[in-house]
């Protein structure tokens, strides 16, 4: 559901790395470097600690690994779309693993605002995530630190309200 009220909870909860995303408008970013997605139906107040009557979607980023690895992908598409994404992972010390993932996406808009001479609904975003995982030897304890950064300079779409007799003409 789409709910813009600042005082109401949405009926389906969205969680990213066990952090509740309170409004669907806050979830306006691309998914990248995903490890798994879990979907749970029905009320989940006890399991997830939130009043989500319709269920929950939990999205987990890929975790740091104890072996070195990585990937790098680049693509080009219509409307001059450029997408570069990748990740690097591996051990930093005997008890600490790290992971860095990123995505850069740029695309021209689908429409043109002729009054202001700009593209509309363009995409210009940068996303980065860094993780440190502490796994001490001879212990069941573990800790995971995740830092996310998103910069979205996209201009979205433009709408103009019409008034008068022509407003309902179709």
Placement of each model-derived feature along the sequence:
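Outer-membrane beta-barrel translocator/receptor signature
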Residues: 10-11, 23, 32-35, 41, ...
């Amino acid at each position: 559901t789409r709910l813009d009220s600042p005082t109401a909870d949405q009926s389906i909860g969205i969680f990213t790395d066990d952090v509740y995303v309170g409004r669907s408008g806050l979830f306006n970013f691309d998914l990248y470097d995903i490890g798994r997605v879990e979907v749970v139906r029905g009320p989940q107040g006890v399991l997830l600690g939130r009043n989500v009557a319709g269920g929950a979607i939990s999205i987990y980023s890929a975790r740091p690994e104890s072996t070195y690895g990585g990937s790098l992908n680049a693509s080009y598409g219509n409307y001059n779309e450029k997408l570069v994404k990748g990740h690097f992972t591996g051990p930093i010390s005997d008890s600490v693993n790290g992971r860095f993932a990123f995505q850069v996406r740029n695309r021209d808009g689908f429409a043109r605002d002729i009054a202001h001479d700009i593209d509309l609904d363009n995409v210009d975003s940068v996303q980065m995530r860094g993780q440190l995982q502490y796994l001490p030897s001879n212990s069941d304890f573990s800790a995971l630190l995740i830092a996310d950064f998103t910069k979205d300079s996209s201009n979205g779409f433009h709408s103009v309200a019409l008034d008068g007799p022509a407003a309902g003409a179709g």
